[in-house]
Amino acid sequence: MAAKVFTQNPIYSQSLVRDKTPQQKHNLDHFSISQHTSKRLVVSSSTMSPPISSSPLSLPSSSSSQAIPPSRAPAVTLPLSRVWREIQGSNNWENLIEPLSPILQQEITRYGNLLSASYKGFDLNPNSKRYLSCKYGKKNLLKESGIHDPDGYQVTKYIYATPDINLNPIKNEPNRARWIGYVAVSSDESVKRLGRRDILVTFRGTVTNHEWLANLKSSLTPARLDPHNPRPDVKVESGFLGLYTSGESESKFGLESCREQLLSEISRLMNKHKGEEISITLAGHSMGSSLAQLLAYDIAELGMNQRRDEKPVPVTVFSFAGPRVGNLGFKKRCEELGVKVLRITNVNDPITKLPGFLFNENFRSLGGVYELPWSCSCYTHVGVELTLDFFDVQNISCVHDLETYITLVNRPRCSKLAVNEDNFGGEFLNRTSELMFSKGRRQALHFTNAATNAAYLLCSISNHMLYYNIF
């Protein structure tokens, strides 16, 4: 194992999981960082000491609405406009992950920031007229969310989804359709820098009670999104599929399902910009990354990205902390259709191990040769993985937080640190005990903070376990 060599890191804003108590919003301080040998960004933290506001290693509170700025990477030979197809995964990100390409790093950060607006704009105040919708109008969403260069994209449509549940509406939540993200298109000025017209769709993760209740529905079911060729062997998680395809007749947003809203708007934008170089980029966090993958598959399966006498429009998913979506048939079909998925994951994030905690792509064959009978029923990840490694004993819930992901992708990397990828549970416990019981770090107050945050994360994990029926 290589020796740990750490450097100080610049200050970045930190936003932890939303809707926590002030005690759970404890800052991550004294972070150290190194790079793992296998596409992994490794962070070690010593956060049991009291937070020092003046420390250059302290991360400020998430109260700031400013997005995390792109990394000041070294100058590159080619501009994005020349290599955008490779950045969108045309070669499956070969030679771009290890080491991480500065341009790819910049684009992951940019899409992550644009995705964060789906959280910052979501209104969870029951007394608000915009409850469960977006707090801002389409013209102001990116600016009000603190997005760098808010004029780079024009938001064209808000997307609403209805959890597919046969339960009476929860009190104070009369409207079951919720705002889950938006569709945007790059501006004329941005086209020059990007090298193409980029159609962007973002999806936030699970927030409301109805969405958690929808999580109780879980099994693999045929997607059947193409009426002319149902492909019963292509199966996806039923809860995600229900959220994607169900509508709400009593919703003020109309009868359209999330799927119908999206396909209609994407088709409109592609017709509007016919003749231009176009890309379709889908960015999602947690549950939202699953919807992004379903939409990407849907677009490609229906042939919406095909153009006569021209190259197909690239369809790319940037998945942050995403769970598995479907079975091996779904994975193979996505690959056949040319759908590209870059999964940004944290080795310490349990959600990325679900569904299929036990029966997954690692349990489909015997010795990597003989396919086992149940392989078609195993959940399987799609795409290429960029693995991060971060953990904070006082803010355990941060292992799944979007802005923590963005911050760590955007940090400079230094020396290497080997980590056993297959020992998730042991690694988690070892880091916890090491940080909690190291010399001089036994203050009761910080132990209480750690316990509170651990309970918060475990509650979230248990909900996901119910969702994914992992047992």
Swiss-Prot record:
Originating species: Arabidopsis thaliana
Name of protein: Galactolipase DONGLE, chloroplastic
Reaction(s) catalysed (UniProt annotation): a 1,2-diacyl-3-O-(beta-D-galactosyl)-sn-glycerol + 2 H2O = 3-beta-D-galactosyl-sn-glycerol + 2 a fatty acid + 2 H(+); a 1,2-diacyl-sn-glycero-3-phosphocholine + H2O = a 2-acyl-sn-glycero-3-phosphocholine + a fatty acid + H(+); a 1,2-diacyl-3-O-[alpha-D-galactosyl-(1->6)-beta-D-galactosyl]-sn-glycerol + H2O = acyl-3-O-[alpha-D-galactosyl-(1->6)-beta-D-galactosyl]-sn-glycerol + a fatty acid + H(+)
Note: Overexpression of DGL causes a dwarf phenotype.
Induction per the UniProt record: Induced by wounding. Induced by methyl jasmonate.
Subcellular location: Plastid, Chloroplast
Transit peptide: 1-88
Tissue specificity field: Expressed in leaves and seedlings. Not detected in flowers, siliques or roots.
Motif segment (GXSXG): 284-288
